[in-house]
């Protein structure tokens, strides 16, 4: 994890925990930092992991405090197939782009579609 301070980026520490043992990361492809210290980690995982209930967005802090996770594999509203990027705005709305669905979906800070 890098910390941006006055346009300088310095290494702080590595965070992460595997979803193989339940909640955690599985092939993380992007991360977005929100005001207030939350990190939103976008996991690509795969269909087999999705079938086991591994969700696509993990919410944690830089200190590795697990907060929650949201979204599932699928074609419905609030579901994603092949996520490519994640972004957070100042109001802490979370945006996830999906290469397979050709869309960007918006969620609130807690993952509600």
Go through each PLM region and give its residues.
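Eukaryotic scaffold repeat domains enriched in small/polar residues
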Residues: 1-113
């Amino acid at each position: 994890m890098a910390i941006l301070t006055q346009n300088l980026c310095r290494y702080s520490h590595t965070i992460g925990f595997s979803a193989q043992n339940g909640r955690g990361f599985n092939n993380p492809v992007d991360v977005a930092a929100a005001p207030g210290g939350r990190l939103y980690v976008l996991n690509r995982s795969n269909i087999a992991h999705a079938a086991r209930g591994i969700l696509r967005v993990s919410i944690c802090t830089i200190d590795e405090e697990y907060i929650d996770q949201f979204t599932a594999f699928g074609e419905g509203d609030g579901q994603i197939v092949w996520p490519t990027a994640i972004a957070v705005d100042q109001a802490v709305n979370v945006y996830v782009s999906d290469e397979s669905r050709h869309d960007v979906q918006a969620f609130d800070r807690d993952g509600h579609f």
